[in-house]
């Protein structure tokens, strides 16, 4: 009788079910298409006024995750797409919660937007730093995620205006890496000096660890330049020699905002 009593109590507890796997990122895709332009700039003012769809998607992230409902994420690609989209959606949510701000660092000044402010994924509170450095990087060991997750800053690889999905995840990651490598905001050769995004310095070990073992020239060293080389514009790749000096750009934490003024994105990070 006692076991039946506990069973009936358990049945009364609302349980989040994945009725139609896999997890649907369509609502987030619609948000991105509506509020993010082709340069990765976000219409935060408009999004803050019309946030219902983003909030609904963030609520669904709070119910489901690869950790809480693995059946909703049948492959590694489904899992990784979830975590990339979750990171980007949580970042947007955090910014509009604090909007208007000039920098993402203004959103949680006292203790840190990335390592103290928490969001809920699959019923578990976690920070953006935890998602990136405790889940994505060690679990999936995929360096291209650094060009997919967005920190809401001008110097960050731009926020893509399409959500990541399992079926085309690899192709999507290739696209964002290629876009990054061919963007003078992040990779620029000036005289005999190569100016690179600070992200390539902060996460250098991720790229060198994944330098392809089947590379055409086995003597190529696992350097940042050689990792980027296949994705660079041919003219730039041909000009990179061994005596090129590398310098990392200062990071611009200004908000990646489209203020609807018609102003273009800055030409490049300041070296």
Task: Please state what every model-predicted region is.
Residues 21-271:
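Interaction/scaffold regions that mediate signaling and macromolecular assembly across diverse proteins
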Residues 1-2:
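N-terminal secretory signal peptides that target proteins for export/translocation
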Residues 5-16:
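Bacterial N-terminal signal peptides
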């Amino acid at each position: 009788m006692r076991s039946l009593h506990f069973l009936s109590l358990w049945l009364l507890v609302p349980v989040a079910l994945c009725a139609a796997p896999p997890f649907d990122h369509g609502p987030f895709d619609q948000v991105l298409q509506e509020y993010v332009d082709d340069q990765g700039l976000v219409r935060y003012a408009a999004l803050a006024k019309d946030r219902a769809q983003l909030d609904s998607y963030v609520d669904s992230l709070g119910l489901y995750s690869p950790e809480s409902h693995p059946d909703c994420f049948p492959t590694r690609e489904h899992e990784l797409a979830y975590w990339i989209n979750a990171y980007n959606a949580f970042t947007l949510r955090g910014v509009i919660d604090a909007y208007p701000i000039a920098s993402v660092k203004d959103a949680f000044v006292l203790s840190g937007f990335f390592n103290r402010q928490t969001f809920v994924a699959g019923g578990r509170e976690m920070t953006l730093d935890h998602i990136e450095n405790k889940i994505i990087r060690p679990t999936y060991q995929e360096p291209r995620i650094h060009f997919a997750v967005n920190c809401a800053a001008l110097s960050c690889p731009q926020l893509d205006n399409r959500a990541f999905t399992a079926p085309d995840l690899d192709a999507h990651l290739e696209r964002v890496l290629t876009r990054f490598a061919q963007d003078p905001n992040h990779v620029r050769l000036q005289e005999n000096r190569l100016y690179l995004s600070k992200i390539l310095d902060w996460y250098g070990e991720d790229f060198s660890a994944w330098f392809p073992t089947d590379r055409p020239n086995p003597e190529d060293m696992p350097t940042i330049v050689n990792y980027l080389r296949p994705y660079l514009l041919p003219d730039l790749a041909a000009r990179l020699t061994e005596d090129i000096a590398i310098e990392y750009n200062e990071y611009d934490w200004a908000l990646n905002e489209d203020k609807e003024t018609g102003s273009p994105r800055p030409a490049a990070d300041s070296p």
